[in-house]
Swiss-Prot record:
A matching Pfam family: NmrA
Record-given protein name: NmrA-like family domain-containing oxidoreductase notA
Source taxonomy: Eukaryota, Fungi, Dikarya, Ascomycota, Pezizomycotina
GO biological process, one term: alkaloid metabolic process
Gene of this entry: notA
Binding site for NADP(+): 13-18, 39-43, 60-61, 81-83, 140, 164-167
Function summary: NmrA-like family domain-containing oxidoreductase; part of the gene cluster that mediates the biosynthesis of notoamide, a fungal indole alkaloid that belongs to a family of natural products containing a characteristic bicyclo[2.2.2]diazaoctane core. The first step of notoamide biosynthesis involves coupling of L-proline and L-tryptophan by the bimodular NRPS notE, to produce cyclo-L-tryptophan-L-proline called brevianamide F.
Statement on biotechnological application from the UniProt entry: Notoamides have been shown to exhibit antitumoral activities. Notoamides A-C show moderate cytotoxicity against HeLa and L1210 cells with IC(50) values in the range of 22-52 mg/ml, but the IC(50) value of notoamide D is greater than 100 mg/ml. Moreover, notoamide C induces G2/M-cell cycle arrest at a concentration of 6.3 mg/ml.
Length: 339
C-alpha cells in the first residue's frame, strides 16, 4: 500500500544516455514511480529499465495522441529530445522545435504534470547577438521557453549539460580526437588534438559523467522542484582545461603519456560532415565567448554537488558515496581498464 503514494515521473527519451541515467537514479528512490517512454519497448535498454522496476510505455514523440496517453497521470516529467536524430540533419522541417512543441502540448493536454525538467541549453544566438550560434542549442532553448511561457506548469527547470566525459569511451571518436585516449602515436603519446577552448588561452570546460552523476543531479531537482523554477541547472561533475585532462591521464596507475596539441586549421580538422559542422560551431562559440559554455551561468560544480548529495541521501547512500566524480577518478574507473 505504501507504493500507492509514489509520485510518477515520466521520462521521455528513457533509453537514451540522459533519460536512462535519470530513470535509473529515480528507481533507487521508493518515493518515485518511473514511467519510461520509448519507441522500442523490446529493446535491450527498455528491458533493462523494466527489470529495475520502470513502467515501459511505447510512444513516438511525433504522435501527440501517444504522448498525451504516456504522460497522463504523471506528477513530473523529464524530457530530452535527440538533436542528432537523422531526421534533423538536413535542416528542413520538421525541426527539433516542432518535435519539442508537440511533446510540450501533449504534456499540457495530459493535465497532471506539475513539474518539468527540460534538457535545454543557452540561447547562443541571443548570447552572441547572432555572431556564434549553435543550431541545436538554440532549438532546445526555444522549446524550453515555450514550456515556461505556457503558464501550465508549477515549475520548469532548464537543464544545461556539461561536456560528456563519455566521449572518451568511444574508440570511433578517438581518431577524431587525435588518438586520445586509446591510440599511441609513434612517440608513445596518447594525443588529444582539438581546437583550443577559449579565445587566447585554455579556459575551463565543464565535464559531466552521465554514468555517475547526471541522473542523480536531475533526481535532486525532483526532490525540491520549487527551488528550481526557471532556474538554470548546469550539470557538472568537474571543471578542467584540456591540459588538466592530460594531467588526469598522467595520474593513472597505468603510467600513460599524454599530450594536448591545439588544432590550428579548424575547418580541415572537422571536415564537411553534419557532425563536423556542428562541432565546429561549438568551438566557434567557445572562441567568441572566451569559453563561456553556459553563457551567463557560471561554470561551477556547486549546484550539481548539492543536488547529487540530496539524491544520494534519498537513495540511502553513505555520506562517503554522495560526491561528484572528478575527471581523474572517472579516467581511473572507466578508461584505465581499457588502455
Amino acid at each position: 500500500m505504501a507504493n500507492d503514494n509514489r509520485r510518477t515521473v515520466t521520462v521521455y527519451g528513457a533509453t537514451g544516455a540522459q533519460g536512462g541515467a535519470v530513470a535509473r537514479s529515480l528507481l533507487k528512490n521508493h518515493a518515485f514511480k518511473v514511467r519510461a517512454i520509448t519507441r522500442k519497448p523490446d529493446s535491450e535498454a527498455a528491458k533493462a529499465l523494466r527489470a529495475l522496476g520502470a513502467e515501459i510505455v511505447q510512444g513516438d514523440g511525433w504522435s501527440k495522441e501517444q504522448m498525451v496517453a504516456a504522460f497522463s497521470g504523471s506528477w513530473a516529467a523529464f524530457v530530452n529530445t535527440n538533436s542528432d536524430d537523422p531526421c534533423f540533419v538536413d535542416g528542413h522541417p520538421p525541426t527539433e522545435v516542432d518535435l519539442g512543441k508537440i511533446i510540450i502540448d501533449a504534456i499540457i493536454e495530459a493535465g497532471t504534470v506539475k513539474h518539468l525538467v527540460y534538457s535545454s541549453f543557452v540561447d547562443t544566438s541571443s548570447f552572441t547577438n547572432g555572431q556564434a550560434s549553435i543550431k541545436a542549442a538554440d532549438m532546445k532553448a526555444k522549446v524550453q521557453r515555450y514550456a515556461a511561457d505556457s503558464g501550465h506548469f508549477d515549475t520548469v527547470c532548464p537543464l544545461y549539460q556539461g561536456w560528456y566525459m563519455g566521449i572518451f569511451l568511444r574508440q570511433d571518436y578517438a581518431r577524431a580526437l587525435g588518438g586520445f585516449p586509446y591510440f599511441q602515436d609513434e612517440d608513445g603519446f596518447r594525443t588529444l588534438h582539438l581546437p583550443r577552448w577559449g579565445t587566447h588561452t585554455d579556459m575551463p570546460i565543464p565535464w559531466i559523467s552521465l554514468e555517475d552523476d547526471f541522473g542523480d543531479i536531475v533526481h535532486g531537482i525532483f526532490l525540491e522542484p520549487e527551488n528550481y523554477n526557471r532556474r538554470v541547472v548546469p550539470t557538472v561533475s568537474d571543471v578542467c582545461t584540456y591540459p588538466e585532462v592530460m594531467d588526469a591521464v598522467h595520474a593513472l596507475a597505468t603510467g600513460q603519456k599524454a599530450q594536448y596539441i591545439p588544432v590550428t586549421d579548424w575547418e580541415a580538422h572537422f571536415g564537411d560532415s553534419h557532425h563536423g559542422r556542428e562541432s565546429l560551431t561549438i568551438f566557434k562559440f567557445g572562441h567568441f565567448t572566451n569559453g563561456k559554455y553556459f553563457g551567463h551561468e557560471p561554470i561551477s560544480t556547486d549546484i550539481s554537488a548539492y543536488l547529487k548529495s540530496k539524491a544520494a541521501e534519498a537513495q540511502g547512500k553513505d555520506p562517503s558515496d554522495r560526491k561528484l566524480i572528478t575527471l581523474s577518478e572517472w579516467f581511473e574507473k572507466h578508461v584505465a581498464p581499457l588502455i
